[in-house]
Amino acid sequence: MARAKNGTVHVARRKRILKKTKGFWGTKKSNYKKAKDTLRKGMMYATRDRKARKRDFRRLWISRISAALSDTGISYSRFIEGLLKSNIKINRKILSNLAIEDAEAFKKIVLEIRR
């Protein structure tokens, strides 16, 4: 009886890794050992940066809102407190877009909070 060495699975696994590293530079796309390590590291970065992207966007929205509020003479923390007290339920992303694209609507929200 012939010895079964699981060759098809071995080849398929290597092909799968090398297929995922298609656009990489140098031997990281063709050498299995380097490709495997680079892919693992890339997946770690991807996971980390998906989490970081959420924090980065929230920070950006807060900066934009704060910059738009500098003209009105109200601080960001007072603005958010006023939103909660006025029961205005608009998230930071929408407020940021309003501050950039529709300044009049944003100023109306600020006036509503000051009342």
UniProtKB/Swiss-Prot annotation:
Function description: Binds directly to 23S ribosomal RNA and is necessary for the in vitro assembly process of the 50S ribosomal subunit. It is not involved in the protein synthesizing functions of that subunit.
GO biological process: ribosomal large subunit assembly; translation
Family named by the database record: Belongs to the bacterial ribosomal protein bL20 family.
Claim: Flavoprotein is one of the keywords in the record: no
GO MF term list: rRNA binding; structural constituent of ribosome
Example of a GO cellular component annotation carried by this entry: ribonucleoprotein complex
Pfam families: Ribosomal_L20
Organism: Borrelia garinii subsp. bavariensis (strain ATCC BAA-2496 / DSM 23469 / PBi)
UniProt keyword terms in alphabetical order: Ribonucleoprotein, Ribosomal protein, RNA-binding, rRNA-binding
Name of protein: Large ribosomal subunit protein bL20
Domain of life: Bacteria
